[in-house]
Amino acid sequence: MHTLLAIATVNAASERVHGYVAAASERILDRGAIPAVLGGDHASPFGLIAELSLRHPGMGILQIDAHADLRDSFEGFAWSHASIFHNVMTRLPGVKRLVQVGIRDVGAREVEFVDRSKGRVKTFYDQRLRDRQYAGATWTTLCKDIIEALPREVYVSFDIDGLTADLCPRTGTPVPGGLAFPEVCHLLELLADSGRRVIGFDLCEVAPGAPDDEWNGCVGARVLYKLAGCALRSRKVI
């Protein structure tokens, strides 16, 4: 009973957080600014995505991540980092397509969810990308395939564990494999120059190291810089 009450308490608190984020996002969007969320837990940006989906029906999401995050719940928690995109795709009809890149830790039910989505979820699994590279495909070609799957208006959701584990050793769930920093930069540059418009973004799951270890924060800050640049470049501001 205590466990069920605790789960219900956390789920209710999570919904309040989403409401707070949505309200803050509304104020930012009303000013004409580009909204961004810096998590914590990858569930953090749900409120922002919800607000954007109301204003930009038909939008797409580019998810860079080690995990699919398509579980219907995780140990009873409906709003955990493992369920963010299940919640997005089942609750937000304004999101036309989810394009996942770098996925390499995924459950059978998540694969079934992708297969049942009728193309609404497009997953570029990390190993499949590498297999194509080993067969001779360039990273530019792969990036263009990824971007081609996105609609005109794009939200970028970046979980730091989408990178190789040496770049984010303190994140909560690092996974072998992943994208190199220059590969991410190239993907974001091509996205910005593709004619698509970045309408917002998030960066989540960056975890600090020891007080004298700035590596994780340094990598996270550089990713944030690139995300902001991608959004501005897509709008011809820079």
Where are the regions a protein language model picked out?
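Conserved alpha-helical scaffold segments that buttress catalytic/binding sites
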Residues: 1-238
